[in-house]
């Protein structure tokens, strides 16, 4: 094995743009809570992981969600709920070559370019462009700017330096005016028609986003800006950034950022806004997972389904007595955590773990050879934003092993531990085959065909699982938009009661899809169904019934779906 790679980290206005539709314009948004139903379901206080009543052994086989039993507890006393009906002319629904619905960006926006193809629309309004064309710059629906308190540019999602410098000068003036004239920090300017300017001041760094996407909330844009800031802290640390700006206020931070860092910032901007990959090496599922963990379900992390006994055996294999190893993480080939070992007194927050996985993925994709180890210092912003942890990374078959230490001199010790772990894995080929087989089974095959996608989050663990996205292009954006509007609708009508475990539900319709949300204090469940020409009406009872079956299945398979050991 060759010596590992080493990453050395040194100690204007709205203009003429297409306006997005408001949330209320997605068709008649209907929200129903159990508080307003005919009976309030006050008696449902089941345990967080087990059904409140015994489940017949034939109803669930540990794999299948489909049930032949009658109506579930969620349906009782909901006779007054209206039918969920897709009021769309069947001729307006187009199908692609595979029979799936053809998504069009122009259906989501009020724009004169309704005849643009998806790719043309994406290129004109969404894709990242660093050119000098000011009209092209103004067309973009989303902008991110990062600059110093002195107005020195650090990063821009779109535009060349000539264009960006002028905008950053204006934004610096606006931020300074708020500080001087109002004695407060600029946080958000809402200018109508969905246009908003959101700012986060992390002196000596200022991050600003200009969003023309009406479905985005101020909170979600704040989370996006915070993620970009965490990336900078992750590769540099707060101490290094402060040191440079303390020495010179107008320091150009771009001097210590690599080309890969700017590529990663581009990737993050597109992922966190649209759930769409910027490069071909990332899949829709991975980018949508990043969006979900950082924005839709903030501070959560995605898990992957494997048998509990298999996860336990992997735990015993990757567990090491090496005192230099602080954290051990085993990843699947698609970047999801299979095993995570940490000492009782220390734990990496999900926010840091998600950023760690993103950075490691970006480094691995740029490796010249897969048999090379990586050794790099990274700062974990929430864990400790002033220091570094040292990460050893090795790929074994389709898995990724990460050993993390607090000592910069622990490379040899961590490499020795990695050798021992890989030897154990090589001696357990039968286990490796079982693992690869289980990871190859998509979660979507266990979901009723009526569902196009679902997300299930365990609130106590702050972990979620979701089914795979449909393969047709840009479907992730349509789902992302629907889920966001679901959350906004839910937030307006749901009243939380800490003493009672009320179930809460809401749904909305957006052209040919219906989004549905069901939650209590133990879980959050989101799903999307798609209207077919053969089935124009889905009753509320039927939708809740199938959703409850998926929820029960997730609870029954809790140990398989989530990292609990």
From Swiss-Prot:
Disordered: region residues: 1-37
Mode of membrane association: Peripheral membrane protein
Family matches, as InterPro entries: FUZ/MON1/HPS1_longin_1, FUZ/MON1/HPS1_longin_2, FUZ/MON1/HPS1_longin_3, Mon1
GO terms classed as biological process: autophagy; protein targeting to vacuole; vesicle-mediated transport
Subcellular location, record wording: Endosome, Multivesicular body membrane; Prevacuolar compartment membrane; Vacuole membrane
UniProt keyword annotation of Protease present: no
GO cellular component terms attached to this protein's record: fungal-type vacuole membrane; Mon1-Ccz1 complex; multivesicular body membrane
Compositional bias of kind Polar residues: 16-37
Coiled coil: none
Keyword Protein transport: yes
Keywords carried by this UniProt record: Autophagy, Endosome, Membrane, Protein transport, Transport, Vacuole
Superkingdom classification of source: Eukaryota
Function, in words: In complex with CCZ1, is required for multiple vacuole delivery pathways including the cytoplasm to vacuole transport (Cvt), autophagy, pexophagy and endocytosis. The MON1-CCZ1 complex acts at the fusion of vesicles with the vacuole, through its regulation of the SNARE complex during the coordinated priming and docking stages of fusion, and particularly at the stage of tethering/docking.
Family recorded in the similarity comment: Belongs to the MON1/SAND family.
Name of the protein in question: Vacuolar fusion protein MON1
UniProt organism field: Candida albicans (strain SC5314 / ATCC MYA-2876)
Gene: MON1
